[in-house]
Amino acid sequence: MQVASLRYEVIFKKAFCDVEVFKAFVKDFLGIDLKIDKVETEKKYEKPIGNVDSRFDLHAEDLENRVIVDIQHRRYPDHYDRFLHYHCAALLQQVENAKNYSPNLTVFTIVVSTSGTKEDVAMAEINFDPIDCFTKKALNKIHHRILYISPKHVNENTPEPYRQWLELIKDSLDEEIDETIYHKHEILKVVDLIKRDGLTPQDRARMKDEYSEAELREKEKAEDFKKGQEKGRQEGRDEGIEIGIEKGIEKGIEKGKLEIAKNLLAQGLPVELIEQTTGISRQLFLTD
């Protein structure tokens, strides 16, 4: 079946902002049965924390379970640090004064990278709960967590229920999916939501925009790399010239000292005194 790739932000949001899909995904990855009736996209807070206006691709608040779940999709060079910052921003937004630093809601962030690098793994976690340094036992005091998942790294060792979700996302990247290998209702719903023939004109337009933006970023990276190479070569040439000049000066000074030593020798000065005065070894000025 032909589908739109989940690497596109617009397609990922189209599929995972569906409440049923979002809840099933969170249940399988976090073990939480969310009580929600909507999923927000491009969520941001009225008063940003610090100098960054953090935005959350997909955001849901469950007041009954007292949790916030954010799902982030886009890949950045500062991938791990960026989404740690966003996660902490969601925590800090809840602290109103110095009387109580405990957030009302536990924050969970799931970061999905469809362009994983060789340094990534299928699933990695930052767990904020303190651990006893000696027994390694968790204190069960802080429950905030961040999951970084990379579908490109799914393999036969990836356990369920994670594996089927990761395989679905990975399979979509070449825009072809064999839906017969999937059996979970919510996963089949994702397949249905991203069918090529079900895309709206707005979906297609945004996909083209994202493709153009990605091309531009790659072009800028290539240009920056080229500029860096040229700068490195120029600095190498400049350094070589500078070293050459320094060596030339050193050689000239040594040659001048040698001439002085020879002149002093011709005037009858003792060899030891000439060595002390010029710093030139007698083997050099006694050769002639």
Give the residues covered by each predicted segment.
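Short, charged alpha-helical interaction segments and adjacent helix-coil junctions
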Residues: 2-6, 63-72, 166-288
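Conserved single-residue anchors adjacent to enzymatic active/cofactor-binding motifs
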Residues: 1-204
